[in-house]
């Protein structure tokens, strides 16, 4: 997976040309995978010992930022009604895991340079709101990806890492967008999963090792596209490929769930890195 800033395409080419899901979330660093491995160890020990505790429900404040080239849908402009639908999609996906989202604010900016995803840090420095516990979502029409996010980590408020934090979403992938495979709003579901600490289900691209560092997601040696129900790229390991998991690359209609282990992981990361900022 390539880092977001390595690929920037022309505004027009970044929308309807996408035939497969693409995620520009940076690969986890060695430090981040060490944290994930430690969390997996602690979570699995608690589960085996029978003393795993249900963490308190989490409500995340969301700040929407719509960046467009004009006040038209073709320019990337999204209405408040569309933002409301996107919020509903997130809440439906995350509610079974005691995570909910509440709109804290929304703003609209006409800026062709920002809309092309060529000035990420400048855009975020100007628009970001709230604390490290608050989710900032930036809708842009010109990113070469369906979306990207940043994993939770230790940050100093006001630092570049603080401003980079958040989720960037291709405008056409919102509910009712022009991308027929990806217009149910689950690009945001997927990227918010990263923001809460989850890796791709195919992390590592192999049938052994640590995978995504979550014990109950089956191993998967490559990403899944479309909706390949019953696919098994790791026949020597238990379970078919988790193609309906939100953290795979399947089409939006194929997605159905997070696992119990992923739920625990999101709460673990929230407690470790974001909860104290509320």
From Swiss-Prot:
Active site residues of this protein: 191
Cleaved signal peptide residues: 1-19
This protein's GO CC annotations: extracellular region
Disulfide bonds: 227-254
Annotated GO MF terms: metal ion binding; metallopeptidase activity
Top-rank EC class of the record's enzyme: hydrolase
Catalytic activity, EC: 3.4.24.-
A Pfam family the protein falls into: Peptidase_M43
Positions contributing to Zn(2+) binding: 190, 194
Keywords, comma-separated and alphabetical: Disulfide bond, Glycoprotein, Hydrolase, Metal-binding, Metalloprotease, Protease, Secreted, Signal, Zinc
InterPro entries: MetalloPept_cat_dom_sf, Peptidase_M43
Localization per Swiss-Prot or TrEMBL: Secreted
GO BP, sorted A to Z: proteolysis
Positions annotated with a glycan in the UniProt record: 51
Main localization (coarse): secreted
Function: Secreted metalloproteinase that allows assimilation of proteinaceous substrates.
Family the entry assigns: Belongs to the peptidase M43B family.
Protein name: Extracellular metalloprotease GLRG_06511
Organism encoding this protein: Colletotrichum graminicola (strain M1.001 / M2 / FGSC 10212)
Organism classification: Eukaryota, Fungi, Dikarya, Ascomycota, Pezizomycotina
